[in-house]
């Protein structure tokens, strides 16, 4: 056998060094030139046309009769936008053909000039030399001093992407037509004003000439006309002819077709003013009589002057600017519309098409949109629905959408659905004065095996330790009873009063032996010993299903209300019994129904506050009723992306009809023991605070997406945190720095499902101790950590309710939450993603959540999954069929099933309520182990 030294002996020293590899030279005819734009940061999205401008812009040009084609202004008005792009040359290109050519002057058989109202021309031009493509919108403005009274202009949207111009031609045409109509309307107004001034000048000149002629006649004793008299007579004749011509022009400009004066972008006041003006024009035929009824008379008094008599065929070469040709108000509005167009079509074609398709698809999916939909789009759809007449024509019935299908009697009650996550039954009594109310249904309990989760513990996380059993908070059921139309209901309708004295209601717990014993024996901060792991399942199996309401949670929040079962039966008698096989759930017809505002609080003799549950729909003739609406504080009338909600956070539990009415949260129902040891526990932190400005703006989406990307890449346990949000488990973000906490809460809010279309269940910042009902209201909470004795109560309550929530500690970089082993969240939040832009990642999240909502919709509205096939089929068989459908048909595994089940529960709750989004789901608990993740 040859050893290594023997091998080395037969080698040379220079053989250890690798010789450099020299590629053979290619002939010149086979050589490929370098990419000419490699120095500009070549990537698949680089502009290959070599355009000299960095972004799209709008150019306004004119074909001047004095200097020819010339650029007037650009939008945005910044030289850095178009760079070295030759605006003069491109203006010559786009204005080389007169697309607005028409005869203006004395037509055959007419003694006076005639104005032709020419339609706009729309063309697409390309310049390969400049690497620019443009949508060009040609229009004609009128100028009294111009040749033929016309001034040709054009507005061009210039881009380096030819496909973008061609694909968006219809949208560009529609938007530029709005700007053109606004500009032309202002031009007609200014042109009519110039004609009026000219007529006043001519009338004054005629009066002066008449006076001078009479003086000359009196001074003439010879009996024949002098040369001066003849000159004055000719000048007077020219003035008379000019007056007739200008009056005819004024009549023509006033007779512009009324239907063309309707501009969608005008403000309501402007539109009404325009219509009134058009009405006056249509009823006025004599130009001299229309001086007081004309639409162009509201202007300062004009002092006439003496002008040189000449025909209107002679023109002054002093031309007006574009701003002078148009009324100031209309010109400003036109520039605003053009700025909106530039912002609207900003970005590449892929982004524009994706956004347009997204908007179209969201309008077609109103059933699941409330879960993750932007509030702006919801408001737009609600406004459109309000504009639809409530009673359509009888001869043609509109098609019924899915959500308007009649409710089958067999599916009326929420109890007919078995929850996908069974609950542990706890009973809580709430004392409010002398009257009590019970309105919560009892559900069964199911055991959970923690050993299965322990076996699948992710070994990549450092220091993962198991805590005590955890109770998952899952909102699934309705929390308020349905009040029937009765005398008692009418008595509850009290006038809204802003002067209400708030007092805390007293609450206590009635502890059941089964459920609370398990809750109190194992603190969440303790580690699970070995002997406890074996006894853990047996402790859970001791939970039995209650046949009645004994041992269940009861929140008694009503005063003198009827029983829930009787109320539901009374309200559901009028529901049609027709069953549609295409859908298994629906809503009542809302043609004659209006929402009643949540009543204020009734002052009792003991000076305490009695909370009345939110009223359902009542008949219009039944007392006070107010239609709810979401305020819009955004001054922009056009850009919907900048719309925002009021300056206070909307409480998902109830929306009062007035902001002046005192707001009452669900703190009255909270556990009073959380106040122990906290001197700083006040109600000030419970008052809804101002959310970040522009919740649905593009800037908010970009920042939220960017911060979410940072969170995913910085924290290796991001997947369990996101799973907690998607599955309905409240996530508490704990930290000292308010700015950091708010940023992270805003970023994680894109993963939080909504209860309704009014507000997300997110609390960005709170400093007082948490109550148990806060976990029902808020699914994402930012909690303050302060190193002071006053904050001991906050940490105490957080430790007490830690089994109800997932806790993300930003200071210690830890997360305590249940284990996640699914495949959905890794695709939703991949730390190795190549996405760099926050807005792009936001669209990615919306796309994934839309797919998730479609699965939840399919699971929710399938008859055979939730109803027994026959009377003898057990609930275990139904649950097995549901699980099989989720795994085999929808391709879900492990914890992904819990996410879809939670979304399905929200869908059921949303469509079983007559006024969705105004109440909270109930607290529902499930035993799951929590694990501590560390970095």
From Swiss-Prot:
Assembly: Component of the C9orf72-SMCR8 complex, at least composed of C9orf72, SMCR8 and WDR41. The complex is formed of two protomers, each individually consisting of one molecule each of C9orf72, SMCR8 and WDR41. The protomers homodimerize via an interaction between C9orf72 (via C-terminus) and SMCR8 (via N-terminus). Within each protomer SMCR8 (via DENN domain) acts as a bridging protein between WDR41 (via C-terminus and N-terminus) and C9orf72 (via C-terminus). The C9orf72-SMCR8 complex associates with the ULK1/ATG1 kinase complex. Interacts with C9orf72; the interaction is direct.
Record keywords: Autophagy, Cell projection, Cytoplasm, Guanine-nucleotide releasing factor, Nucleus, Phosphoprotein, Synapse, Transcription, Transcription regulation
Species in which this protein is naturally found: Mus musculus (Mouse)
Tissue distribution: Widely expressed. Expressed in the forebrain and hippocampus (at protein level).
Family affiliation: Belongs to the SMCR8 family.
Gene behind the chain: Smcr8
Ranges of compositional bias, category Polar residues: 277-289, 677-686
Name recorded for this polypeptide: Guanine nucleotide exchange protein SMCR8
Function text: Component of the C9orf72-SMCR8 complex, a complex that has guanine nucleotide exchange factor (GEF) activity and regulates autophagy. In the complex, C9orf72 and SMCR8 probably constitute the catalytic subunits that promote the exchange of GDP to GTP, converting inactive GDP-bound RAB8A and RAB39B into their active GTP-bound form, thereby promoting autophagosome maturation. The C9orf72-SMCR8 complex also acts as a negative regulator of autophagy initiation by interacting with the ULK1/ATG1 kinase complex and inhibiting its protein kinase activity.
Annotated ranges, domain cDENN FLCN/SMCR8-type: 318-833
Compartment annotation: Cytoplasm; Nucleus; Presynapse; Postsynapse
Matches recorded under Pfam families: Folliculin
This protein's GO CC annotations: Atg1/ULK1 kinase complex; cell projection; chromatin; cytoplasm; guanyl-nucleotide exchange factor complex; nucleoplasm; postsynapse; presynapse
One Gene Ontology term of the molecular function aspect: protein kinase inhibitor activity
